Amino acid sequence: MVDGKSAIARCADVAKFQSLAAIDVPGTRAIVNPGGTNERFAKAHFKQAQLIAYPDNVTIFDQIIKGKADIMVTDGSETLWQSKLHPELCPINPGKPLQFAEKAFMLPRGDVPFKEFVDTWMHQLKATGEYDQIVDHWLK
């Protein structure tokens, strides 16, 4: 699955945050969960925006809804999922991520038959359109 970092904000604020440059301005409060790729991305790209470290991944999006933060940058797939859970939040350009990443299955090293099985299974899912149906069901 092709993915990458994308932003999520209150739906009313989406127009303000269409690019990294638009996010990284004084006065923007970007919330991050400490210790992962989201924090690394924010620290690398946001020099003027205020970074707010928030340790609870379960309620971090509620902080945006409550107005305690303006935006979060996370995986594009997560912005789609969270916007389904929280209709007040909207993903910002998840189809055009701020950087490129791919999702993968972790498989046992050296288990070639199992890897070939998974590769065939994924190929069939994509060829039949079932993969897109699954993504649409869960993320769109």
Where do the language-model regions lie?
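Short helix-initiation/N-cap motifs at beta->coil->alpha
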Residues: 15-18, 52-66, 101
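Hydrophobic residues within well-ordered alpha-helices
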Residues: 23, 64-65, 105, 118
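Periplasmic-binding protein-like
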Residues: 1-6, 76, 80-123, 140
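Beta->alpha turn/N-cap motifs
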Residues: 10, 34-36, 56-57, 73-82, ...
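Flexible hinge/capping segments at coil-to-helix
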Residues: 10-29
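Ligand-binding clefts/hinges and TM-proximal coupling segments of bilobed small-molecule sensing domains
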Residues: 37-54, 91-94, 122-140
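Short, well-ordered beta-strand segments
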Residues: 29-32, 72, 106
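Short helices/loops that flank or line small-molecule/ion binding pockets
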Residues: 21-22, 44-45, 58-77, 85
